Amino acid sequence: PYDTYGFLHEVHRREAVSWFILAADRNRPFDIGLNPKLDVLPSLVESLSNHPGGGDVCWHPGYKAVDDAHVCQHESDRFWSWTSTNRNMVRAHFLRSEPSRDWIRWEAMGVAHDASLGWARDVGFRAGTSRPFQAYDVEGERPLALTIHSVAAMDSALKEGLGWRPERAAEEMDRLISVVSE
């Protein structure tokens, strides 16, 4: 049920797509999917990088990587060793992310963009803005070399968090898109 890449390729064939790929060791129930130790995942990454509409293949840190710096380094090294990956953007688990910690870590790793700021059980912009903004280290009192891209909605929030059927989710997403496009 998780293999929707062909469907997504077809639906977005004329649009640039950012793919966020989990390269974590399998850790049920949170990090499941393709085994990063097998050739199939790096092959998928290469295939996604050749998307007709363009786009990037970016790293999605696993559940354990958010708390453990060694796991984080191992995963990032693994992911970025594969051809055709984008080192400039990440998207971590919403519920596990801590901006005060993670933004500093991403900057130190050379990541320039983070798309991890969003709601796991609701829609809307967690930072109060739909526009990208520069991250700031409150404790260190300095701007960071990291741009934050707020996420307006996640599929699981629409289905499980809000209990919306696909038709309702489509209506609400259309409304949200019209608000931010003004």
Language-model features: locations:
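Active-site-adjacent pocket scaffolds in enzyme catalytic domains
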Residues: 1-11, 38, 42-46, 78-181
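Short, well-structured secondary-structure segments
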Residues: 1-63
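A compositional/structural signature marking long, glycine- and acidic/polar-rich segments
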Residues: 57, 61-80
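Glycine-rich phosphate/ribose-binding loops and adjacent secondary-structure elements
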Residues: 51-52, 59, 70-72, 86, ...
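A short acidic (Asp/Glu
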Residues: 28-34, 69-72, 99-104, 126-127
